[in-house]
């Protein structure tokens, strides 16, 4: 099984920590966000990872080299221009199609600035059992941006802001708003179905395909610890969470 870590962001909300380093190398409890994410993936048995980079890209490459790639096979996908989640995955898509075995296995797509105890093994198992095209970890929590699911947890739309009208692609009587956790399980055939080009959000692709009847599913993650660490105060809170053994 393979994985991709999204690590190309500028990390502007983490300044001054990101004045001299990429977001992926910001530390929580003595470990970088990149190391924490790689450790989670490695625990799942993943040995092949691709990481997209942009801001201070060479520092990530040097860091990985200094740590022997943490015993993994790691490829780097450089972005001269930030491509967002969809464009980033599409550019790196070759990595998941390079051999016949990988082309049949789902892969993990994981934001580097997300800490969680989400059971990735269980999430992959559910993805396979449901024969989903993509499975998205999501929680009931406050957020200005929400994904909308039906009673069977099929993606039906999104609300991009509190003051914006929701975008509905699959009308349903009882839509359930959930906040996305930045963790996906994706079937490789999704890569061949991405029609969007350039800079685009992967959610755009998901919604277009959901409107066609493709199975884009939610994975309930309310029972797990989760924290976005894209802001300075969130990094500080995550350090406290670590002391309280909320994650490891």
Task: Give residue spans per PLM region.
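Glycine-rich N-terminal loop/short-helix segment of MobA-like nucleotidyltransferase
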Residues: 1-29, 42-44, 220
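Conserved N-terminal catalytic core of the sugar/cofactor nucleotidyltransferase
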Residues: 2-5, 27, 31-111, 122, ...
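A generic "binding-loop/recognition-motif" signal
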Residues: 10, 21, 56, 142-143, ...
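Hydrophobic packing residues within well-ordered alpha-helices of enzyme cores
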Residues: 14, 60-64, 238
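Catalytic-core segments of class I nucleotidyltransferases/pyrophosphorylases
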Residues: 46, 101, 107-108, 115, ...
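A short, conserved acidic/glycine-rich loop-to-beta-strand motif
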Residues: 130-140
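Short beta-strand-to-turn element immediately C-terminal to the catalytic PLP-Schiff-base lysine
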Residues: 148-150
């Amino acid at each position: 099984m393979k994985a991709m870590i999204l690590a190309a962001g500028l990390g502007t909300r983490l300044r001054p920590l990101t004045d001299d380093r990429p977001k992926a190398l910001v530390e929580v409890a003595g470990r970088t966000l990149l190391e924490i994410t790689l450790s989670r993936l490695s625990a799942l048995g993943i040995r092949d990872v691709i990481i997209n980079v942009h801001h201070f890209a060479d520092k990530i490459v040097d860091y990985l080299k200094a740590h022997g790639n943490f015993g993994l096979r790691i490829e780097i996908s450089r972005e001269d221009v930030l491509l967002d989640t969809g464009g980033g995955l599409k550019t790196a898509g070759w990595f998941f199609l390079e051999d016949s075995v990988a082309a049949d296995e789902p892969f993990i797509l994981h934001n580097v600035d997300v800490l969680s105890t989400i059971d990735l093994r269980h999430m992959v198992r559910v993805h396979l059992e449901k024969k989903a095209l993509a499975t998205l970890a999501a929680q009931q929590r406050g957020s200005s941006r929400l994904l909308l699911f039906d009673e069977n947890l099929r993606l039906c739309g999104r609300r991009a802001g509190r003051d914006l009208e929701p975008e509905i692609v699959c009308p349903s009587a009882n839509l359930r708003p959930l906040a996305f956790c930045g963790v996906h399980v994706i079937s490789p055939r999704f890569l061949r179905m991405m029609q969007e080009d350039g800079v685009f959000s992967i959610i755009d692709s998901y919604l277009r395909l959901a409107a066609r009847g493709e199975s884009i599913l939610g994975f309930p993650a309310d029972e797990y610890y989760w924290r976005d660490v894209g802001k300075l105060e969130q990094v500080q809170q995550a350090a406290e969470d670590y002391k309280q053994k909320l994650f490891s």
